[in-house]
Amino acid sequence: IKEHGPIAGERVLQMIHPVIKALSAIHKTGIIHRDISPDNILVNQKEELVLIDFGSARAERQTMTQSMTVLFKRGYTPEEQYRGRGNWGAWSDVYSLCATMYFMLTGIVPNESIERMIHDDIKLLRDMPHIRLSATEEDAIMRGMAVKANRRFQSMESLEAALYESRGWVQRVVLYFQHKSKSVLLAGGAVVLAGVLAVCALLTMGGKLSAIGS
């Protein structure tokens, strides 16, 4: 994005959809990524997105303690992850993913969530004519970036429905992923390791990967 500029709205939706499906499957195992940002989403030679870096992933039922790894990515970390006993969950990944989509669409790093708690003057997608998404889609991304967790979509499934149902994309992608998602769900916590191994395999095979923010 730094090299070529923002990505067209429909193309962003196409590229990010498999990531939403993957996160939905991961969340069903009770695992939250907690570190989604452009730095951790790579693009391969087929322009497919690969989510990496599960080093901060945690079981949803865990509470934050001083011994747990906490990473803050300016513009992409929801406010609850800054608090020692923040109530984080799937909605936290929703925030980070929608903030990443915002960057892909605009080339602008979103305002920091903690700063937005004091004064929220983030520029809305609907005020940027070049985005070329429907009002429903733009509002869905901004809702996913709501500062307060209870105002966001509470799951990747609800975010997906808001973004894709009007385009008729949801069922088609669900069918495509169905045979793969079963093995992911059965794997439980091993899904994290599987994701890391998948990236390693791409690198070993010589697949060229670059961060979407580069």
Where is each model-derived feature located?
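AlphaC helix of the protein kinase catalytic domain
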Residues: 1-7
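Activation segment signature within eukaryotic-like protein kinase domains
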Residues: 15-16
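Protein kinase catalytic-loop region centered on the HRD/HxD motif
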Residues: 19-31
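Canonical protein kinase catalytic loop motif
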Residues: 32, 37-38, 42
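Activation-loop N-terminal segment of eukaryotic-like protein kinases
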Residues: 43-47
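Pre-DFG segment of protein kinase catalytic domains
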Residues: 50-53
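C-terminal lobe helix-coil module of Hanks-type protein kinase domains
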Residues: 75-167
